Regions:
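Hydrophobic transmembrane alpha-helices of multi-pass solute/ion transporters
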Residues: 1-77, 90, 94, 98, ...
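Hydrophobic core segments of alpha-helical transmembrane domains in multi-pass membrane transport
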Residues: 10-23, 35-46, 72-79, 115, ...
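Alpha-helical transmembrane segments of multi-pass membrane proteins, especially transporters
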Residues: 31-39, 64, 72, 107, ...
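Transmembrane helix-loop junctions in multi-pass membrane proteins
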Residues: 47-55, 87, 120-121, 161-181, ...
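Membrane-embedded alpha-helical segments and adjacent helix-loop junctions characteristic
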Residues: 54-139, 366-470
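Hydrophobic transmembrane alpha-helices that form the pore/transport pathway of multi-pass ion
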Residues: 96-98, 102-216, 428, 434-437, ...
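Intrinsically disordered, low-complexity non-transmembrane regions of multi-pass membrane transporters
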Residues: 263-290, 319-338, 569-573
């Protein structure tokens, strides 16, 4: 394969996805299917991939997506059921009272602390929080933007740690050495103090511009909230603690606790019921807060039980593990490996989510109408997000096994010409062109993948193998570089058309998505740049050369920012 032609063909599906999303405004699932088809055709006709390999690799990708795709399905089921029983509305009423009337405190309690908790248990801030923010007097743009960026601080641990679990599985597969979930989580956690503080401060800027950004108390509590979340993430992912799956849940609870203590010490109210209207008061009377919280309480309890109690964890994750085998393949060094995917079906977060929903049912009114509406709305809401979550995994596996052909025994053979493998070719070109500066690109590639797919998990699936191979070529720390890609994918949440449209639709503000993305783009790019700098510093042993590269990158970006700011300044009359 000609390197230049191959590079263009590899980039083509990604460019097509951008065009479909941005210009034609196609949904993520439609875009994903089109891009997958194009990738398969390119793999077969340009990279000489066996058609059977392409199809089986796609199926393997879909199975590998189960931790996120099935989690999307079960979380939609739980949220729909809670909505039909009134539990969701009762919780939203409680959320409205938080913050004590202080704008910075409301933002950090609801969009940051509560957002962390909700994302952690599989709830959706973009569906639940926009009406709350609007009721508190924030503009429609801010009411959409804040819950969207609320996905960002610790996205790796969202949905009971699904992205971290997928990273563990994918990285173990491409590297040939099994890593533990807590270890993968600890690598991501090292980025979190900086990322979390940046996101907390960005929330103030989005909500109130310079006025809130330079508000002394607001900036102080934003830093407190961000540092608290980051340090909690590090602690939860220590080997002796091993609570990766509950990192977001615990971090959200700790942030809320710290802000509560701050208000107590400052002698300021933590709650304000003045925001409640008659409908809210009726919701309070109809259902108690503790009953409304039961599905989430059960879910957290099950997560603790299956994570901390070793006999139960081992029985569900290992003894009852269901392994799906798709055959064998040969690596570039002629090692033959099994393409087997360990589903850990009964241990996964999606199973716990389903069980928690079922166990909670006796505590709520379950007449025929509630169950019928839950079923009909679930069938309407779930399929497309599930497909969108799964299809990019299929695309990633096709890229990983492009150029492979089966021998007479059925083993997939690595291409005789290595450039017929998309991942190998892309890794070779970029590592040769950028050298030791290559780690700077990982977070931005993740940002791009996260924007296209709407998911950090999909970004991990798409590019982890590529980053591993490129890092090995230049002698960089591959797990740091690959994790940086995941961080970038998480930061894309504030740019995700699907998430932003969801938030806008909840408050009947479809059409403001472009304005939200423009605000979010500034935050996403700045935080991704900070992540890229940390990646470069940590990818190699510290030296004057890497420090020089970091300073050079800062200077270049500062100059570009200064030029743009100067060009946009108002002209004098």
């Amino acid at each position: 394969m000609n390197p230049l032609l191959g590079f263009i063909l590899i980039i083509l599906p990604i460019a097509l996805a951008l065009v479909l999303l941005v210009y034609f405004k196609k949904a993520a699932d439609t875009t994903g299917v089109v891009v997958w088809i194009v990738t398969v055709l390119i793999a077969i006709f340009a990279f000489q991939t066996d058609i059977g390999v392409a199809i089986i690799a796609s199926l393997a990708g879909i199975v590998r997506s189960f931790p996120i795709s099935l989690m999307v399905a079960t979380s939609i089921l739980m949220m729909t059921y809670m909505q039909e029983t009134g539990a969701l509305q009762r919780l939203i009423v409680f959320f409205k009272t938080l913050g004590g009337g202080s704008r910075p405190m409301q933002i950090l309690i609801i969009s940051f602390g509560l957002g962390l908790f909700l994302v952690g248990i599989g709830a959706t801030p973009v569906s639940m929080l926009p009406p709350v923010m609007l009721a508190l007097g924030f503009s429609p743009l801010v009411s959409v933007a804040l819950p969207s960026i609320g996905y960002d601080p610790l996205t790796t641990y969202a949905l009971l740690g699904v992205p971290a679990q997928v990273f563990t599985d994918v990285y173990s597969g491409v590297s040939g050495s099994v890593i533990d979930l807590w270890f993968a989580g600890s690598v991501f956690a090292s980025f979190m103090p900086v990322v979390s503080v940046g996101i907390a401060i960005a929330m103030l800027w989005i909500a109130g511009g310079k006025k809130l950004l330079f508000n002394r108390e607001g900036l102080f509590i934003a830093i407190i909230a961000g540092v608290t979340a980051g340090i909690t993430a590090i602690i939860c992912n220590l080997e002796v603690v091993n609570l990766t799956r509950l990192t977001n849940v615990i971090a959200g609870a700790v942030v809320l606790g710290v802000l509560f203590v701050y208000n107590k010490v400052s002698k300021k109210p933590f709650m304000d019921r003045a925001q409640l209207d008659e409908n809210d008061l009726n919701s309070e009377k109809a259902l108690s807060l503790w009953r409304a919280s039961i599905p989430w309480v059960i879910l957290v309890f099950l997560s603790l039980l299956t994570t901390l109690v070793e006999p139960i964890r081992n029985f569900l994750a290992n003894t009852l593990d269901i392994v799906i085998n798709f055959g064998q393949y040969q690596t570039a060094d002629f090692t033959v490996r099994s393409l087997s995917i360990s589903t850990k079906f009964l241990w996964q977060a999606y199973t716990l989510m389903l069980i928690a929903t079922l166990i909670s049912m006796p505590f709520f009114k379950n007449d025929r109408k509630v169950l019928k509406n839950t079923y009909s709305k679930f069938i309407k809401r779930a399929p497309r997000p599930v497909l969108a979550a799964a299809i990019f995994f299929a695309m990633a596996e096709v890229m990983n096994f492009s150029g492979f052909i089966p021998d007479i025994s059925g083993v997939w053979i690595f291409p005789t010409d290595p450039t017929n493998n998309m991942v190998y070719l892309l890794a070779s070109i970029t590592s040769a062109a950028l050298g030791t500066a290559y780690p700077l690109t990982a977070a931005f590639l993740g940002l791009l993948a996260g924007f296209i797919s709407g998911s950090e998990t999909s970004a991990i699936a798409m590019f982890t193998n590529y980053h591993y191979q490129a890092s090995m070529t230049i002698g960089a720390n591959s797990i740091i570089v690959a994790a940086s890609n995941g961080i970038g994918g998480g930061l894309a949440s504030v740019l995700s058309p699907a998430k932003i449209q969801n938030a806008a639709a909840v408050i009947d503000q479809i059409g403001i998505e472009g304005d939200v993305i423009r605000y979010g783009l500034v935050v996403a790019v700045l935080m991704t740049f900070a992540t890229a700098l940390m990646t470069l510093l940590w990818a190699f042993p510290l030296s004057l050369y890497t420090i020089g590269l970091v300073f050079a990158a800062i200077i270049v970006v500062s100059l570009i920012g200064g030029i743009i700011s100067w060009m946009r300044r108002p002209t004098s009359q």
